[in-house]
Amino acid sequence: MRRISRITVAGAATASLALALAACGGTSTDSGSESKGDKGLAIAYDVGGKGDQSFNDAAYAGLEQAKKEFGYETADVEPTDGETDADKEQRLSSLAKQGYNPVVGIGYAYASAMKNVAAKYPDTTFGIVDDATIEAKNVADLVFNEQEASYLAGVAAAKSTKTNTVGFVGGVDVPLIHKFQAGYEQGVKDTDPKVKVV
């Protein structure tokens, strides 16, 4: 069950990020950007960083795919333990100041920092994964319907269980994971109501 869920989520996230990075590849305005010379694409990872076998790794795979398919120069930066919004703001500012465009924050934890940095760098396009709260012309929200992918994982789990019991581990107690869990449980229930989710 867990492997199918990771493959589904990672595949969807990788494809979505590669397309989003390509779509964000232009600048938010026509003025000023060409004169400073955009370096390419940059992503700032969320907690866990590369090697998390989850959404950060999916983001990295999308970045590498964009680099390979479109020839973009890329940069990626890791989070630090116990970091603050000020640390995130500094990281995003550094990437924008270096000329990376777009700059994508992987995860809703970047929302506060990105809102501030986007205002300081209006000619840089920013993207944020799993957050739709920033209303700025130069910020693209990259929000997924996570409950749809997890529904399919629930279907696969219900079809493959031999014990009529499947498990779900959400990782963190946040609304996004609650939606993921709801989709998973609904997929199990719709496929076989006798299967119990623990």
Model feature map: region roles:
Residues D85-G99:
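Short, well-structured alpha-helical segments in soluble
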Residues R6-I7, L21-G37:
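Bacterial lipoprotein signal-peptidase II cleavage site
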Residues M1-A22:
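Sec-dependent bacterial lipoprotein signal peptides
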Residues G32-E34, L41-E69, A75-K88, G107-Y110, ...:
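Extracytoplasmic "Venus flytrap"
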Residues K97-G107, G127-V129:
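Periplasmic-binding protein-like
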Residues L63, Y151-V198:
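An alpha-beta-alpha
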Residues A119-V143:
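Flexible loop/hinge segments that line or gate small-molecule binding clefts
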Residues Y108-N116, K120:
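Hydrophobic alpha-helical
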